[in-house]
Each structure stands twice: as structure tokens, then as C-alpha cells.
């Protein structure tokens, strides 16, 4: 019908104009942030918590102090950094259970799991970070956001879900 034809022509013109102007998904995200497609195009940097909320300690930090940071920051994880500020490992509740015997006699560097195995850059799409969190090897609820090996933020699965990224 003529209505269907008009819709098809309008769509074709819109697509041609988008291509000619070099319109990218990132442009759509900026212009329509409240919509479902805009939410799907949000980046980790848009949703992460900044440096002031990072639970970080040095490798030589006594476990008593590392536990205080873990409790104070309330993320359930503590990142361990080297002297240059690079993330070299993480301490989770699983690490605490594995080292429960004499835990307070250790340093953060002795208890940490080297890595951590899962980190994300601030430029990654939040939907990709959610997929990484869901990967069962192992599934995690918190990711450190790193830039050039240094932690710049932290992201919880609830931040992604609250933003409507699914």
C-alpha cells in the first residue's frame, strides 16, 4: 500500500543520510541516552565508580589493614598494587577462606590471587563487561577498571543492571 511504500522510502532516506554523515552507534548513544539502544551502548567509563571508591592496598600491607579497606569500601574485594600503581592482584572472600589459618600474620601480597584475571578498560561497552562477568570461568560480580595497567575505577554488576544494560 502507499503507506507502506512511504515508510520504506522514509527509512531508506534516513539510512542514506546517516551513512553520508558518518553517524556511528556512539553518536546514537549521545543523542538518545535514555532509550534501550542508548543504554546498550553505554561504556564501562559511564557507569564505573571512580578512584576515590577504589579498594586498593600495596603488596606489603598487613592483612589486618587490607581487611579494614575491604570492609570500609564495601565491594567484597581489595585490589593489590605495586609501587608504580599497577594492579598486580586481588583479594576476595575466597582468598580469605583459603588463608584463614594465620590470616592476620600475612601481607596482602601473600594472600592475593595474582592477576586479577578479569579487568576491563573504561572504553569497553557495559554490555560486554556484563558478558565477561557472567562467564563461568569464574563468574564475578565486581570488575576493576584499568587503564594502562593502573586501576581507574570499579564496576559492580548492579551498576550495569540499574542502567538498563541487558
Kindly give the residue locations of the regions a language model identified:
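Generic structural signal for well-ordered, non-membrane alpha-helical segments
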Residues: 2-6, 10, 37-40, 59-63, ...
Amino acid at each position: 500500500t502507499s503507506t507502506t511504500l512511504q515508510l520504506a522510502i522514509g527509512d531508506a532516506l534516513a539510512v542514506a543520510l546517516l551513512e553520508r554523515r558518518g553517524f556511528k552507534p556512539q553518536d546514537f548513544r549521545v543523542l538518545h541516552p535514555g532509550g534501550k539502544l542508548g543504554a546498550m551502548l553505554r561504556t564501562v567509563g559511564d557507569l564505573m565508580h571512580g578512584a576515590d571508591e577504589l579498594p586498593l592496598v600495596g603488596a606489603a600491607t598487613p592483612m589486618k589493614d587490607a581487611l579494614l579497606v575491604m570492609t570500609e569500601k564495601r565491594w567484597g574485594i581489595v585490589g593489590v598494587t605495586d609501587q608504580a600503581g599497577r594492579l598486580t592482584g586481588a583479594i576476595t572472600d575466597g582468598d580469605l577462606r583459603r588463608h584463614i589459618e594465620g590470616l592476620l600474620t600475612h601481607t596482602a601480597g601473600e594472600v592475593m590471587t595474582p592477576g586479577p584475571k578479569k579487568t576491563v578498560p573504561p572504553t569497553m561497552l557495559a554490555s560486554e563487561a556484563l558478558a565477561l562477568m557472567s562467564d563461568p570461568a569464574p563468574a564475578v560480580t565486581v570488575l576493576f577498571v584499568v587503564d594502562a595497567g593502573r586501576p581507574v575505577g570499579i564496576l559492580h554488576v548492579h551498576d550495569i543492571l540499574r542502567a538498563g544494560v541487558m
